[in-house]
Amino acid sequence: MRFATAAPVATDSFAPLSVPVDAGLNAVRGDIAAVLSMRHGGPRPVRLRYECVGRADAPVVVLAGGISAHRHVAANAEFPEKGWAEGLVAAGRALDPASLRILAFDFIGADGALDLPIDTADQADALALLLDHLGIARLQCFVGYSYGALVGQQFAIRHRQRVQKLIAVSGAHRPHPYAAAWRALQRRAVALGQLQCAESHGLSLARQFAMLSYRTPEEFGERFDAAPEVVNGRVRVAAEDYLDAAGAQYVARTPVDAYLRLSESIDLHRIDPAAIQVPTVVVAVEGDRLVPLADCVGLVEGLGPRGSLRVLRSPYG
């Protein structure tokens, strides 16, 4: 089955709000204002927030994660707080700042400022704008996890001359119906909270549902195999403290509109694998219920000789 892919768009306007990357800096953050032509909303003002780590003259790799990821991937001298990809970005690791320039960015809509449908194609075009601002003509590689893998697919299609290789981890060419239904129920939980004037509770519950999809029954069996307790006249099972904490942490850092619109964006994603013309490594996790191995195999088959598959085993579904 083939899916239509949006045609590339012309570069939109932008106005720098931060200093250019300095060759003497190990890490730099920036924030620019741009006008982006969006598939479902026309021209819209957006903010493009990024962080670069590594030598300014090194080959550039973009690293993008799931909808909860952001521009800060790993602690460094300039920005010592913990990042979301500490295991990947470090000396001697797969992405070593000593030999690569690693660029990460906040997805448009992640700040909650866009309350309209956001396509993965919009994210790819926003990245192209960012590369223009930074004076980066071409990426050595785009490494994408989950939602980032979907954005990477769109970037490889819409801006194919600007990337040499794509690595797509846990991201297929279309959402699986089971995963789409799961996300739809999560969004309904948020909507129910909004009706009760308690949208943070709805968002917390949606995140708690998500944790069940990120973890396997085997892990829960090992970690939470304790008898339930009766607390204030209610039965409370062993995993509830963990789920409550995960929900609270997510609510503290995530605007509700950001969650809703980026969740929808996953379900909007559709591409024709044959349209990806760069060498692509697809990484699947065995037992992943949201991005099944069969879907990743379908993506690789559609890529033809340009695609290869790696399968990982993990306790995290």
Please describe what each predicted stretch is:
Residues 276, 282-284, 288:
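Short beta-strand/loop motif that positions the catalytic acidic residue
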Residues 23, 30, 187-278:
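Alpha/beta-hydrolase
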Residues 138-177:
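Conserved hydrolase catalytic core segment
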Residues 167-196:
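Flexible "cap/lid" loop of the alpha/beta hydrolase fold
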Residues 51-110:
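N-terminal cap/lid subdomain of alpha/beta-hydrolase-fold enzymes
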Residues 306, 312-317:
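Histidine-bearing beta->alpha loop at or near hydrolase active sites
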Residues 289-295:
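Conserved alpha/beta-hydrolase "acid-adjacent" motif
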Residues 121-140:
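Conserved acidic catalytic loop of the alpha/beta-hydrolase fold
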